[in-house]
């Protein structure tokens, strides 16, 4: 197979291109080696990305040593935690598609032969995955790694262990805490570089990347602060050169992203996601990834999987365990191992480093006698409790692995943390095309809920009614016109879910939105309602006092109105202002462009390809 870069490295026509490569530091004697694009996302705004400049240099050196030509570039990264609660959050989800575009543009414009992606936080991971699946060249993912959890000591001497970003958000709405208490949380909940501690969106996506087969073992769970992460970066760099040579020298197309990320691989990844109670945002992103890969994987597949897979890992914010605890229990291969023993996975899939799932699990599942010493050692990587934005600050190890599948961080199928899966798809007259709830984070006592609606038309209005105590126990807060088109941008609702907990009513209210929730959200928080209000969805017809009925066991969500009543309301709405939010929000041209092409949440909130084809006139 001729390398993509061969056209530039040979012949008189492209002498100018070679001159530019020489000027950028490529030695002429290296012409003919595979050009490996390093898609980095270094960014000083985000603790999850602040160290990636060092990672990029490390990977670049390792690629060169392995026989490739490393060429590093950067794309953007939005910090959802910083963008949260104001109009900045409108830009988060749209950035995913722009990130995908930037990687595609850069790689194709410069004829790169292979790609190594260094994402970490929420939208960067799926954006790069979408690009890799579009490009379909040899690709390896290696993320920046998760942050350590913090330890907070309050002024009165109270010690709070395993605190994270969500704790400071809860604290900010707790009227019982003073400013000194709040400052103590603020200073300690994010102690290291890395993606926010807990099974939030970033860590969920990095785990999913490992499960689908495009990253090496440990990608989802080795802490950013641990020296073993440095080893992982080097191995990833060596692996991308190896598979580039397999493809171009040996005509082995099994190493390509689309050969790895088949429908069966998507089903395995989603099975793992449901089993670990990942962020609801993973549903949006895996649907978008499937479209980029031309794989027929839909919300119906996710709904089917959610009915058959229990939750066997309840990590923060849904449970007591931190990412480092999940790592000690064997990480993602530990979860996959339990699912494999239960017959829940397709075995005829492969990955960037193994020809079969069975071979990988034989080497990396700590519950198997065949598990390698390398794997056992890697899964001992522990927090170092060194407060620093620098990576690789320590070599701390746990005393032992967690092989307790009854009471440990990872359970076996016979002793699940929750008998139902950690994610569920609900449908009903309020969400005909579906909606999503993170069941792992919902207290069992409110899996069924019936209460009057309190309707708002923006996240800002939602925050106001929570903080001024308009939202009462027993109510269902309906937040509409925050979908992909209606927002536009489909904001996350972490502040509302955090503030109801801070107010002490987290187990007494429901939230429903055509927007989405942070991976850090928990409680009865139903998102991705489709169709959204701006697309004439029934959520646009709800009025204050309407009775909302939620039944997670039976997977339903309804408003107690007849079809005739809903039809009458629709006629009245369309005779009036129509499907328009009543709020004061200025929308930029950039966001209007996103809204113009955005599809519904049940389609991954991606751009509408048919509309693009129609308007462009291009096939």
Swiss-Prot record:
SUPFAM superfamilies: IlvD/EDD N-terminal domain-like (SSF143975), LeuD/IlvD-like (SSF52016). Binds 1 [2Fe-2S] cluster per subunit. This cluster acts as a Lewis acid cofactor. The keyword Signal does not apply. Its cofactor is [2Fe-2S] cluster; Mg(2+). Mg(2+) binds at residues 80, 122-123, 492. InterPro entries: Dihydro-acid_dehy_C, DihydroxyA_deHydtase, DiOHA_6PGluconate_deHydtase_CS, ILV_EDD_C, ILV_EDD_N, IlvD/EDD_N. It catalyses: (2R)-2,3-dihydroxy-3-methylbutanoate = 3-methyl-2-oxobutanoate + H2O; (2R,3R)-2,3-dihydroxy-3-methylpentanoate = (S)-3-methyl-2-oxopentanoate + H2O. The active site is at 518 (proton acceptor). Its EC number is 4.2.1.9. PROSITE patterns: ILVD_EDD_1 (PS00886), ILVD_EDD_2 (PS00887). One of its GO terms (cellular component) is cytosol. GO terms for biological process: isoleucine biosynthetic process; L-valine biosynthetic process. Keywords: 2Fe-2S, Amino-acid biosynthesis, Branched-chain amino acid biosynthesis, Iron, Iron-sulfur, Lyase, Magnesium, Metal-binding. GO terms for molecular function: 2 iron, 2 sulfur cluster binding; dihydroxy-acid dehydratase activity; magnesium ion binding. Pathway: Amino-acid biosynthesis; L-isoleucine biosynthesis; L-isoleucine from 2-oxobutanoate: step 3/4; Amino-acid biosynthesis; L-valine biosynthesis; L-valine from pyruvate: step 3/4. The modification N6-carboxylysine is found at residue 123. Belongs to the IlvD/Edd family. NCBIfam families: ilvD (TIGR00110), PRK12448.1 (NF009103). Homodimer. Functions in the biosynthesis of branched-chain amino acids. Catalyzes the dehydration of (2R,3R)-2,3-dihydroxy-3-methylpentanoate (2,3-dihydroxy-3-methylvalerate) into 2-oxo-3-methylpentanoate (2-oxo-3-methylvalerate) and of (2R)-2,3-dihydroxy-3-methylbutanoate (2,3-dihydroxyisovalerate) into 2-oxo-3-methylbutanoate (2-oxoisovalerate), the penultimate precursor to L-isoleucine and L-valine, respectively. This is Dihydroxy-acid dehydratase. It comes from Bifidobacterium adolescentis (strain ATCC 15703 / DSM 20083 / NCTC 11814 / E194a).
